[in-house]
């Protein structure tokens, strides 16, 4: 029997089924760099507006992990999506270069080398070199992810111009009257010997002592109440602060019960305390808290006086209703202390050890000098003697330093703060507080997910003043001079601008290198003898908060692009970068520095647990890239609900690889089957069949859906729509039905050429939607298809744009045939019956069948194509009968070329195939 395989249109494509991504992607990216692809994205002429995504800076320390990849890939997808929509895009990657982690790395290095480095400039030089090293490492690792941006000129917070911009932002804060030096309690990390901002504190579970202590009322107070004996009972989980107690706060207007044994507690808590065994049950007297104000008790630890005061923060839900008050160790205590003019005792040094003030102030005996506060607690509790009514251990949520993961303490020190509740002049001349301006600004920002708005609002409503100063070396200095004559900072414009210019020219190391005279402008140098330098550095959150100013307003390539269209970071940045940027934007410009905030979750293992080296559940980014390639990692990011935590395991990436293969193989099939198209046919109109119209209408519908959800940055929903279309309507229905025409019709067949145009349009749409995600792969698709490039008028992926299907195909509308749903129902029932017949050995495939359909209104050609039967009608040999159709053995012979049972003679081509063979001669 003659072979006809070579007469079929079994077209091929050079686009490989195997992507070999880890080998090919670096070559593609190198080509993009050589061709300056991102500059094309920035400088496109046919644009429809601008789009700026401002990059929240990662820290220039260590290698990238999967969390970094998630963040940067999402940003890249968002930026590319806007580019392919027709916009000029701006994305300058940046790095946060100052701060404690780098200092710690250098200190550890010096310790290993058994050397010390007292010279601050040399120490800062080592820090700078460390940041440079890891900045380059991370930059190259980002490039491996297929991320495009202005990597030739990224922003770095340690660049001289950038340091000057940060300092100028600080100067503006000072000039608006919002920067003040104050002595108040702040979060203090004894592990790194520095103040911490609220954003640098994380909460973890900690075991602490829980003690109830009796403070006996003094004789004069007892006489005032006309009682012989009474002790206020306080509850605390920080026994180490008892030596700094100066007051006991009660709840205003609340009732307090005196027990028979002389213990005074809130009546509302009496029964709870009896159950705990803290106090006895019999109540002998009741007092209103207001009548107890200004009584005096005795601290049993050091016999110092403790004033009875009233406080709004006192709870009647737990404790005793009598709150131990030490203004040096708590925010509420401090503010209440201001009201009552209480002494602020601070007997703890920067290392968390008791200092000499315990002796001078007679707070503790000298045996505690130099002892760490947490170590001293056991002795303190022993020293309380009978005044310690109950000692327990509790596990509770406690603030920890986010860098060292050690507990932090509240410690009153002199620091610099940005004031949240100090009115300052707005652009319209009115006066509002920073808190008010920030809360108003939030209302004008779009949040994805929307819950982010309320989360940020609550944080702004409740946050304290922003502690800016740090007692470290590697950072931008709080470069102010204190006038020793007035003890006030010098905020003269000439002095401040001179310092900023020095920083811009020589870097802010000069603050440590130069004498005061050399830091002053010539006209002010006579005052040098009256000045002293502030030697604190700035909170690194102020560095990163000011990035919008440097990048979008001052000197960078994106100048004039503030506020940015989008910022996109992890959900923890509501308390970090989003918040600090918002506050600084509201100070400098009376508005948020961004229009939209998008947040993503965190990377966790397949059980939902946080990844850590100790657990052995870390998935290596480097290994993933080597095994799967960056486009698979990018598809994994996009195919997940990134707004929640993302679970990771090798299994998830294997599943993603299957999704990738489905898209790739579909594109390969499409490319192969329109590869023989005559380019002259691309612009003319075609006669599209009802089946073509079905697919085109479906394509239009899903395109609108995908555009809509992609606009909301819901990439997983969009990809699921695309995958369902590719699997069901495209592969499962249309391509199955069209293979006969594609393979067996004449190349000049109008029907086949119309199908090819449909495939071309589908490929165009898939490339457009997938390009922001699978950029390497879509570049490869275009490299291997002259026809697709000609159709799209694109030489590479960066020329891609969306197409109007109707315009491209010269159609007024795409409308699927009437009764098409009935056809699909018939197809489903037919396939079910066909499976039964195959199992019973009656037929081997659908082509052996002829079908007679009860619903006569159904188009015969469509029935034949969709069901892939050889003909529609009746025949002699009935093989099956159902309520909706009857199946017969096809009455003709099998065509040896197309395999349909349409030949009149055995081993002879059918009429259609004879005509095609004749044309091929």
From Swiss-Prot:
<keyword id="KW-0648">Protein biosynthesis</keyword>
<comment type="function">
    <text>Catalyzes the attachment of isoleucine to tRNA(Ile). As IleRS can inadvertently accommodate and process structurally similar amino acids such as valine, to avoid such errors it has two additional distinct tRNA(Ile)-dependent editing activities. One activity is designated as 'pretransfer' editing and involves the hydrolysis of activated Val-AMP. The other activity is designated 'posttransfer' editing and involves deacylation of mischarged Val-tRNA(Ile).</text>
</comment>
<dbReference type="GO" id="GO:0008270">
    <property type="term" value="F:zinc ion binding"/>
</dbReference>
<feature type="binding site">
    <location>
        <position position="910"/>
    </location>
    <ligand>
        <name>Zn(2+)</name>
    </ligand>
</feature>
<dbReference type="GO" id="GO:0002161">
    <property type="term" value="F:aminoacyl-tRNA deacylase activity"/>
</dbReference>
<feature type="binding site">
    <location>
        <position position="613"/>
    </location>
    <ligand>
        <name>ATP</name>
    </ligand>
</feature>
<feature type="binding site">
    <location>
        <position position="913"/>
    </location>
    <ligand>
        <name>Zn(2+)</name>
    </ligand>
</feature>
<feature type="binding site">
    <location>
        <position position="895"/>
    </location>
    <ligand>
        <name>Zn(2+)</name>
    </ligand>
</feature>
<keyword id="KW-0436">Ligase</keyword>
<keyword id="KW-0547">Nucleotide-binding</keyword>
<keyword id="KW-0862">Zinc</keyword>
<keyword id="KW-0030">Aminoacyl-tRNA synthetase</keyword>
<dbReference type="Pfam" id="PF00133">
    <property type="entry name" value="tRNA-synt_1"/>
</dbReference>
<dbReference type="InterPro" id="IPR013155">
    <property type="entry name" value="M/V/L/I-tRNA-synth_anticd-bd"/>
</dbReference>
<dbReference type="Pfam" id="PF08264">
    <property type="entry name" value="Anticodon_1"/>
</dbReference>
<dbReference type="GO" id="GO:0005524">
    <property type="term" value="F:ATP binding"/>
</dbReference>
<dbReference type="InterPro" id="IPR050081">
    <property type="entry name" value="Ile-tRNA_ligase"/>
</dbReference>
<comment type="subunit">
    <text>Monomer.</text>
</comment>
<comment type="similarity">
    <text>Belongs to the class-I aminoacyl-tRNA synthetase family. IleS type 1 subfamily.</text>
</comment>
<dbReference type="InterPro" id="IPR033708">
    <property type="entry name" value="Anticodon_Ile_BEm"/>
</dbReference>
<dbReference type="InterPro" id="IPR002301">
    <property type="entry name" value="Ile-tRNA-ligase"/>
</dbReference>
<feature type="binding site">
    <location>
        <position position="898"/>
    </location>
    <ligand>
        <name>Zn(2+)</name>
    </ligand>
</feature>
<dbReference type="GO" id="GO:0006428">
    <property type="term" value="P:isoleucyl-tRNA aminoacylation"/>
</dbReference>
<protein>
    <recommendedName>
        <fullName>Isoleucine--tRNA ligase</fullName>
        <ecNumber>6.1.1.5</ecNumber>
    </recommendedName>
</protein>
<dbReference type="InterPro" id="IPR023585">
    <property type="entry name" value="Ile-tRNA-ligase_type1"/>
</dbReference>
<feature type="binding site">
    <location>
        <position position="569"/>
    </location>
    <ligand>
        <name>L-isoleucyl-5'-AMP</name>
    </ligand>
</feature>
<feature type="short sequence motif" description="'HIGH' region">
    <location>
        <begin position="58"/>
        <end position="68"/>
    </location>
</feature>
<keyword id="KW-0067">ATP-binding</keyword>
<dbReference type="GO" id="GO:0000049">
    <property type="term" value="F:tRNA binding"/>
</dbReference>
<feature type="short sequence motif" description="'KMSKS' region">
    <location>
        <begin position="610"/>
        <end position="614"/>
    </location>
</feature>
<dbReference type="GO" id="GO:0005829">
    <property type="term" value="C:cytosol"/>
</dbReference>
<dbReference type="InterPro" id="IPR014729">
    <property type="entry name" value="Rossmann-like_a/b/a_fold"/>
</dbReference>
<keyword id="KW-0963">Cytoplasm</keyword>
<dbReference type="InterPro" id="IPR002300">
    <property type="entry name" value="aa-tRNA-synth_Ia"/>
</dbReference>
<dbReference type="InterPro" id="IPR001412">
    <property type="entry name" value="aa-tRNA-synth_I_CS"/>
</dbReference>
<keyword id="KW-0479">Metal-binding</keyword>
<dbReference type="GO" id="GO:0004822">
    <property type="term" value="F:isoleucine-tRNA ligase activity"/>
</dbReference>
<dbReference type="InterPro" id="IPR009080">
    <property type="entry name" value="tRNAsynth_Ia_anticodon-bd"/>
</dbReference>
<dbReference type="InterPro" id="IPR009008">
    <property type="entry name" value="Val/Leu/Ile-tRNA-synth_edit"/>
</dbReference>
